[in-house]
Amino acid sequence: MNDLNPQASEYFPYPTVRPHQDQFISAISEAIEARKSVLVEGSNGLGKTIAALSACLPKAIDENLKILYVARTHRQHERVIEELKAIFKRQPVSGIAIRGRHEMCLNDLLIQHPLDTRAIMEICELLKSRGRCKYYRKIEERQREYSELQRQISTRPCTASELQTVCRRTGFCPYELSKSALPDVRVIALSYLYVFDPVIRTAFLSNLETPLSRIILIVDEAHNLPETAVNIASTKLSLFVIKQSENEAKKFKHKDVAAFAKTIRAEIEENVARMSKQELVSPDFLLKLVQEKAGVADPLDFFEHLHDTGVLIKKSLLADGKFPRSYIYTMGYFMLKWHETANDQAYINVVSKYVSKEGIPSARLEIVALDPSKTTMPVFSQVYASVIMSGTLQPMDAYIRITGLQEDTVRNVLPSPFPKEHILPLISCGVTTAMEKRTPEMYRKITRKLKEIVVNTPANTGIFTPSFQVLNALLESGLKNALNKPLFCEHRNMTSRENERMVAEYKEHSTQTGAVLLGVQGGRSSEGVDFPGDEMNSVAIVGLPYAEPTPKVKAQIEYFDERFPGFGREYGYVLPAMKKASQAAGRPIRTPDDKGAMIFLDHRFSSAYCRSFLPAWIQEDLEIVEDEDGAIAHKLNGFFRRVC
């Protein structure tokens, strides 16, 4: 414990410090003391969660600040609270993990309908205001019991699962209980949306009763933030929603809206028939349709009318005891957003063709954000201090520029805690998934190399491809029959629950003869899921996951090139792909005790340029294997004999 500063050691609950954990804590403590942002790249196994909490809590308590710990998954949120429980044994500190309303809600009227976060927020408020939620009503009916429960929740660490269990027993609303506890809780673990979506953030900060200037922000798995930020600022409108708006308008006798929806749908269908799969369109594309074809003189005024009509319909449905969803409201929101962003160079407008889950060809209008900093900078510029951490943040200068962080942001890359002898990183030449090289013979060659990896791996193997197109091509080339172990395969429309079941079954084989998990880079299994021990001895990274060069991707590159001359392709195309590949490659190595091989099956990884974007702990001992039968097997056999 002598390696930690005295303040942090008061909150560090474990008898020993992991390698480089003291450096991690010192870097964060110094940055927070100076009220700066700090970027910390550190691989799994460092104990980043407890290190960040131990470093932030002394200042938070001394200055009466809140700590918001944002992460992608519920599993990560629960982990934060588990670490707080360990701290609680030494120091009285409170914390809560909160989920979205839809995940915490007990009201059948809401949970049986799939909706986006903003729609859920609006409908929840509507249900409460009209007295249609029994779980909310019970708060008033049993105020004394509720207040006591709120006091208990706000004085100690509590996971979202624990809170839901209590509320199922007592009949109170879990979301309202967590919300009412927020002003009195020190640490809140939550999703990116609560902090970075401006609409949701405004409501959340009001409930928190704390401005951004009194918040220390911790962003975990921060390599995901740029993509999440542009997704938050983007929106879409399908032909299905326009058609449903037309039907809804007829039902509620809004003839002007019905005529508008019918005209717009017909015009878009006619234009789409002449278009390729995805095309950029001018903002005037829609505005001219509205004015010239639908006969609307003032588009903005009519879009507000659509929005207001949707609000009235939702209230009417709720009054009749029906689910208050309005397609007209959704259409109105989209049209207002289109008008708002029409002259903003940080947005593009797209028309895309796609096939629905039911296999029906359709199309949609999209408003696509190009600049993550438009979403992230308003947060980073106002918080007391921020800790941004991940295993893949380099090059840090690029990350700082893309997210709009201050130039004086502290940069810290920590050494790997993994013993070098536990890791075997290889690049196999002679194969590639480059578009022009995707031939049946190339897929057969990749399959032979994958067989070599699986056969010479003691237990479980992971295989991650750049896309479902490549994944399916490997299956067609005979991959399943070539393997001597059961194959578990991710598919495009798999739900989160289905994926969890599949991964759990795959992991069970690690104690038997082993199995193979086949998924995509950037997918559910290649990020956010740990495979310690024999759950994944080897991982094969098949190809570079470069995005398909769609008009959207090209526009992103051009936008970054204009903002950061000479870096457009790197920031908008190369970096996102290399981060996905790096995340997938790190799946087998999650603790200092793990031993694993990672094999990059694409000669492009051998270039100095691509290698420079891999994490330092992978780069250090990266070895290029010649394109010869048995070359990979020789390396794997020697490695696993040595470490197993």
PLM region spans:
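Conserved interdomain hinge at the start of the Helicase C-terminal
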Residues: 378, 432-466
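Conserved pre-motif I regulatory segment
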Residues: 1-40
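A substrate-engagement module of RecA-like helicase motors
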Residues: 2-11, 16, 61-188, 196, ...
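Walker A/P-loop
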Residues: 34-52
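Conserved RecA-like P-loop NTPase helicase motor core
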Residues: 429-441, 492-606
